Each structure stands twice: as C-alpha cells, then as structure tokens.
C-alpha cells in the first residue's frame, strides 16, 4: 500500500472517530415535537451482506463467520436491538447526505433504511421501549445544515456541538425532543430495565455524565471530576457503568482543557477506561495504557469490557479492539487489522460482536459495519 493511500485512510479513520462519538443528548423538561416520516432510503447494499474468511485477520481467534453489512461511505456506532435482530448506526454517504444520519439494518444485511430526518448531524442511536422506539442525538434544531468542522489549528480536537437528544418510532415518525439547553448533550445509551438514559452534557460547565428518565425528567449528575467523561454504557445487570475519561494531570493540562472547552472543543488524545456504580459512586480506573482508549462496552458476563485503543502507537490512527477484566487484569488484543477497528458491541446473548472497521474497503478511507460470531 502506498504511503499516500495509507495516509488517506488514516485521515478518514480519524474523521470517523471525530464524528461518531459526537452527538447530542441532555435532560430537562421534555419538549414534544412531531416530524414527517423520513421514509426509507434506497441502499445499494441492502441484502448484500458479505461473508468471507478473508475478512478475518491472522490472530483474530475470537471471530468466526465474519460478515460485512455496509459497503460504502463512513458507517459507525452500530448497536443491537434488545432481541439481537437489528442494528441502529450512523452513516454518511455522499449520495444520501452530507452529514451523519441514523439508519436501521437487519443483522443479515437486509432492510437498510434511514430513520433520522436528514437534517443536521446525528449520533449515538439506541433502541428502547421493547425496540419500538429509538433515541439519538442531533444538531438539526440548531441548524439544518452540517456543522462546520472544528478548528484543527488547535491540534486534533473534537467539537462539542449543539446536540440535543430525541426519541422517535423506528420508522422515524413521532419525533420528540428530550433536551433543550443549548449545551452539548450527547452519547446517550439505555439502562437494561429501559427506565434510564445515561448521557454526556456540558450543561454545568464541564463535560460530565448524567442520567435521566426516558421522558427527559429527573436529571441526575453522575460524575464530578474536571475533565472529559463520555461514551458511557450500563452493565448487563444495570448496577454499574463503564465510560471513557480524559482528566487533566497538570496545571498546564487543566488550562489547555478549559481553554478548549470555552471554545466548545476537547482534545481526545489521552483517554482511559473507568467503571463505577450506576450512580457514579466508587469510580475506579480500569486501564492505564496511554493513548486514546475509548468505546468501552460490557461483555454480557458483566466481568469483562471490550474497547478500542491506539495505545501501541498513540500518535497513530491504528485502533484495535481489546478485551479486559473489570479489575484491569487479563488484557487481550482482539483485532489485528492495520487500520481502524472500533465501536464494538456484543449482542445481548454474547454470541455476536458488531464493530466498525476500515478492512475490505472498496475505496481508501471507507469505514463499514462488520458482525462476527464470537468464539470464547
């Protein structure tokens, strides 16, 4: 592979990380809103799931029967429905939208259709209410066009855009706004009992985790340490949470963090994985690896965490998947591709893993959704 192509793919991988983890979600009094159905999007890959041993790299012993579900554009953050039959994910394809939108697809690759309204940028889709509704974040209330890219003269930074959290039926109808405070409200996921959302917000001047009821009421702050807390998920029994965190370690780090935050930016180059009780008590650091460790998700056994990391080359964009015990022991590398693998999620029964990867791209920089049968 030429250096120019590799550089292009690495830049695209960075762009996926940038857009995929940014979303909108916050909680105060819910504001109801009704929108027209976006209707299904024509998708050339619908029903074309690829299955091949060539999708498995040497060393990927936990994977069997890997299937590629999308075949163009940038696709990321695919999350299972509670019955394991569907996925919701964000997708940006030039022929369909200038910005990431939310799509649903069956796990066999059929039935791809858009469920967001096609405006603004969306992120962090999740099923709830027995898979009859979805929750996701969007910037469309602030502006229907794509948000401007961040100021990279500041280095590699993520923008903390004007995202709010919404719910809708799985066909995109009955859109309801849950948050409305002008802050960054995003990265929302659901408790196993379906009653609480956990999300990231800047509403109180820092980037913290909060929970709220699924109707937007009873907002409670979960984290209180200065720094970036985000991308949280509940454990299978709902008693714990796992998230990524980047905490300033020096006075200079804190000053840089606060300066960027004032401009609605954050630098994600150093993040580690943390766990705590669901109310935020007894927080504990799981990883101490350096680099960017993010996108953690509990294994269904509740004792292990899968996540993405570039700790073997912190200045690079080659992220791989890793598995680690909640006690910080037993680190194991899962993927061995030479580009980008991230955003892993286990199916509810633990038999499948879905993730986003640059592997098998038809053109440089494509990121697609893959699903594998999981082998212990």
Regions picked out by a protein language model, each given a short descriptive name:
Residues 26-28:
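Bacterial signal peptide processing site
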Residues 39-64, 163:
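Blade/loop signatures of beta-propeller domains
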Residues 65-68, 110-112, 155, 162, ...:
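Predominantly a core beta-strand signature of beta-propeller blades
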Residues 71-74, 90-102, 117-122, 137-164, ...:
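A flexible loop/linker signature enriched in serine peptidases of the S9 family
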Residues 82-83, 129-130, 192-193, 236-237, ...:
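Residue-level detector of Asp-centered blade-edge/turn motifs that repeat once per structural unit
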Residues 106-110, 169-173, 213-217, 277-281, ...:
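Short loop/turn segments that connect beta-strands within beta-propeller blades
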């Amino acid at each position: 592979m030429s250096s120019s192509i590799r550089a292009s793919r690495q830049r695209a991988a960075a762009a996926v990380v940038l857009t995929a983890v940014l979303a909108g979600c916050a909680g105060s009094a819910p504001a109801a809103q009704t929108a027209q159905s976006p209707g299904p999007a024509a998708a050339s890959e619908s029903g074309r799931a690829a299955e091949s041993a060539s999708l498995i790299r040497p060393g990927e012993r936990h994977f069997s029967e890997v299937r590629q579900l999308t075949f163009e554009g940038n696709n990321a953050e695919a999350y299972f429905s509670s019955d394991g039959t569907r996925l919701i994910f964000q997708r940006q394809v030039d022929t369909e939208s200038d910005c990431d939108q939310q799509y649903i697809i069956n796990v066999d690759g059929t039935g791809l259709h858009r469920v967001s309204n096609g405006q603004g940028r969306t992120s962090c889709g999740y099923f709830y209410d027995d898979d009859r509704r979805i929750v996701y974040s969007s910037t469309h209330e602030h502006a229907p066009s794509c948000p401007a890219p961040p100021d990279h003269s500041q280095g590699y930074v993520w923008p903390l855009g004007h995202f709010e959290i919404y719910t809708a039926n799985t066909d995109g109808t009955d859109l309801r706004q849950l948050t409305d405070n002008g802050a960054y409200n995003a990265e929302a996921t659901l408790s196993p009992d379906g009653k609480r959302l956990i999300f990231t917000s800047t509403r109180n001047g820092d980037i913290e985790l909060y929970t709220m009821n699924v109707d937007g009421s009873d907002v409670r702050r979960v984290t209180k340490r200065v720094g970036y807390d985000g991308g949280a998920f509940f454990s299978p029994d709902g008693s714990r949470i796992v998230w990524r965190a980047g905490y300033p370690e020096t006075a200079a780090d804190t000053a840089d963090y606060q300066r960027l935050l004032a401009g609605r930016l954050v630098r994600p180059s150093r993040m580690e994985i943390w766990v705590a009780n669901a109310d935020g008590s007894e927080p504990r650091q799981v990883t101490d690896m350096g680099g960017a460790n993010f996108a953690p998700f509990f294994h269904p056994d509740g004792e292990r965490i899968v996540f993405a990391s570039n700790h073997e080359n912190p200045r690079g964009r080659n992220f791989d998947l890793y598995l680690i015990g909640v006690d910080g022991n037993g680190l194991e590398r899962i993927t061995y591709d030479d580009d980008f693998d991230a955003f892993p999620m286990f199916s509810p029964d633990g038999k499948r893993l879905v993730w986003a990867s640059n592997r098998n791209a038809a053109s440089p920089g494509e990121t697609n959704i893959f699903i594998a049968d999981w082998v212990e």
